[in-house]
């Protein structure tokens, strides 16, 4: 993928797609390709590269991405705000950069308000304010998103996560249960399950996490977390069964394989531990090969 990203002969849309495909496998090996993509002449490539900066530490993210706050293309500037909002507070900014950032943030807000009748715009504003550390404004924006479209489920999840960060899981549970009256969708069940684990309400958590894993079997993370919760509840055989089923659907998932190795080892099943360990080693070897 790195070679395709760096090859100017490859069409821009293909290079942007290569950057999107790189996201789950991003490593230090890929840094030069991402940095080069941030300077690419085509704006869709620059936008795709900005989306990868979340994996970097905030100070480095700011240092690398800040020039794009003044990009000549508006959509790139907006993507830069999204990528850098929570990084700005981690570095001491000279006056010129503070002004550039403030201008870009104002432009981002104005762009969202053009579609203020859509819940997605309020979600975006809430996420921006949350990353800027403006908790009250973020809460109000997420509430506005829910009021605008009660069936827009990401707003419930984001608001509950904001409450988690604020130490208000009681409010978060109420929000998620409100969302579940609209839809039993997996993301709501998963978020509720994690909240209930934090609250030490394990049986309720297992019910919610199991519902998420069953509703969205294509998402390995749900099965992984559900299996860990089962194991912590003393149900190792059930946990292994959940992981094995998930592994059959997602053969290249590192977390699933790692958990299978761990649980097989703890169970004294040497043959299974070796089998899953070999699969994990093969996956790691493939990931280390140049893309």
Label each region the model flagged.
Residues 55, 86, 131, 165-166, ...:
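Register position in tetratricopeptide repeats
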Residues 25, 40-41, 56, 71-72, ...:
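Structural marker of alpha-solenoid helical repeat scaffolds
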Residues 121, 155, 188-189, 222, ...:
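TPR alpha-solenoid repeat register
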Residues 1-5, 27-39, 57-69, 91-107, ...:
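Amphipathic alpha-helical scaffolding segments comprising HEAT/armadillo-like alpha-solenoid repeats
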Residues 108-109, 142, 176, 209, ...:
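Hydrophobic/aromatic packing residues within the alpha-helices of TPR/SEL1-like helical repeat arrays
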Residues 73, 118, 152, 185-186, ...:
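Residue-level recognition of tetratricopeptide repeat
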